């Protein structure tokens, strides 16, 4: 298994900046929509350069890969809604990112990410440095029936700077904001729970 877990990934000041940005993003997003596939709200999030640079530095150091760049970052909030319970079936990621930081921003419960046979806790300011393209991962049965419980996380997806997906990602990011937003509204998550 190439994935690993780390608690207290960021110092208090840096984590506070990330957490504040995520909460403002969730509050102000018109497209933070709920998908019944996973039982979560989700969309993509564009951090400012300071936070992006911090995330890149953390990934490069943790994975020991010095040319990782961000492909995209997903913001999620797992929560029961209208009787739909969060779930994540066992799968390998089938997109072009090669490394993912799965960072817990806030949580009212511990709903671990299982990688291989190892459960990694959902603690605030912890991260799974995930080789999701190689390591099978899932989550166990959701541990609550309370609709007020939740897990807020970001999935920062990386690939080497010279990869084709980074070139495509950069072209997408260069499109006008309204075009990017219109395209994002049409994105549908892949249902890994079918596997």
Task: Give, region by region, the residue ranges found by the protein language model.
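Non-heme Fe(II)/2-oxoglutarate
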Residues: 1-63
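Glycine-rich loops and low-complexity Gly/Arg-rich segments
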Residues: 29-33, 99-104, 179-184
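A short coil-to-beta-strand element that immediately follows conserved catalytic motifs
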Residues: 64-74
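Catalytic core of non-heme Fe(II) oxygenases with the double-stranded beta-helix
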Residues: 69, 78-140, 147-175
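Short, cationic low-complexity segments
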Residues: 174-195
């Amino acid at each position: 298994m190439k994935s690993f877990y780390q608690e207290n990934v960021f110092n208090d000041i840096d984590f506070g900046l990330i957490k504040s940005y995520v909460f403002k993003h969730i509050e102000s997003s018109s497209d933070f929509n709920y998908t019944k596939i996973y039982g979560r709200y989700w969309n993509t999030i564009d951090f400012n350069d300071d936070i992006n640079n911090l995330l890149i530095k953390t990934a490069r150091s943790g994975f020991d890969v010095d040319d990782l760049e961000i492909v995209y970052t997903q913001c999620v909030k797992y929560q029961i809604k209208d009787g739909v319970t969060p779930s994540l079936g066992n799968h390998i990621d089938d997109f072009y990112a090669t490394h993912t930081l799965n960072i817990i921003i806030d949580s009212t419960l511990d709903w671990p990410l299982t990688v291989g046979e190892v459960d990694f806790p959902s603690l605030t300011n912890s991260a799974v440095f995930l080789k999701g393209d190689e390591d099978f991962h899932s989550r166990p049965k959701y541990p609550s029936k309370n609709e007020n419980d939740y897990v807020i996380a970001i999935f920062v997806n990386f690939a080497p700077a010279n990869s084709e997906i980074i070139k495509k990602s950069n072209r997408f990011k260069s499109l006008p904001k309204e075009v990017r937003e219109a395209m994002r509204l049409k994105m549908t998550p892949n249902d890994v729970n079918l596997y």
